[in-house]
A protein has these predicted regions:
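Conserved mid-core segment of classical short-chain dehydrogenase/reductases
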Residues: 77-91, 110, 132-135, 172-174, ...
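Active-site helix of classical SDR
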Residues: 105, 139, 147
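Catalytic Tyr-X3-Lys loop
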Residues: 76, 86-102, 119, 143, ...
Length: 237
């Protein structure tokens, strides 16, 4: 369906989960994919929270290929809450989730190919929360805001958009009962739901889209839920 023949694509956090699926779909579409992850992979292993690691990674990509056509900032930050999370935990999450996407965009900007695209993976938690998720939520809110700032700053060099996934089961499990039926689309998401949208946003079909956020959550964040409505109940601990 998609053709990214001879395109150079960078995917952070591409060794597993959504990132791995994104990398595989780009590769299947003809792209050369450069992954950076703290987990083992076939291109570059390193900590995205470390400035020198980002610089060494960018240097290798440019030395190997000379340009970048698509930058997918997917790596997920550590989640910790206000009760148990330390200053260091929270700061680390922001370095992975916000600072690294900013710095990689800065490092690669002089080398973007014609029609370049950046897609930042945020989360539906950029607009709603559960208790004790402060570091993750702050990072995802940050990358969502960073998206429209970069879209303006990089106008003419690259389009910049973000995706906010909802419940995505990276094992492709099929859910039944309330887990599925609570979703307006009747199922839980899987990594392909996100990867397909990433490839679309990086394609010429999305050439008039920049600075936007696409929430892919099966409609969950559009439901207005109150205790007692339509069979919904609040169970308090």
């Amino acid at each position: 369906m998609w053709s990214f023949q001879d395109k150079i694509v960078v995917v952070t956090g591409g060794a597993r989960g959504i990132g791995r699926c994104i990398a595989e779909q780009f590769s299947a579409a003809g792209a050369t994919v450069c992954i950076i992850d703290c987990l083992e992979n076939d291109y570059f292993v390193g900590d995205l929270a470390d400035k020198s690691t980002l610089e060494r990674f960018a240097e290798r990509v440019i030395a190997d290929y000379g340009r970048v056509d698509c930058l997918i900032n997917n790596a997920a930050p550590k989640s910790c809450g206000i009760t148990s999370g330390s200053y260091e935990d929270f700061e680390y999450a922001q370095r992975v989730g916000v600072t690294a996407p900013f710095y990689l965009a800065k490092l690669f900007a002089p080398y973007f190919g014609e029609g370049a695209s950046i897609v930042n993976i945020s989360s539906s938690r950029d607009r709603m929360s559960q208790p004790e998720t402060e570091s993750y939520t702050a990072a995802k809110g940050g990358i969502s805001a960073l998206t429209h700032a970069l879209a303006v700053s990089l106008a003419g060099k690259a389009r910049v958009n973000s995706i906010s996934p909802g419940w995505i089961d990276t094992s492709y499990a099929v859910y039944e009962g309330a887990d599925a039926t609570q979703q307006p689309v009747g199922r839980v998401g899987n990594p392909l739901d996100i990867a397909n949208a990433v490839l679309y946003l990086c394609s010429e079909l999305a050439g008039f889209i920049t600075g936007e956020n696409l929430c892919i959550d099966g409609g969950m964040t559009r439901q207005m839920i109150y205790h007692g409505d339509y069979g919904w109940t609040l169970e308090q601990a």
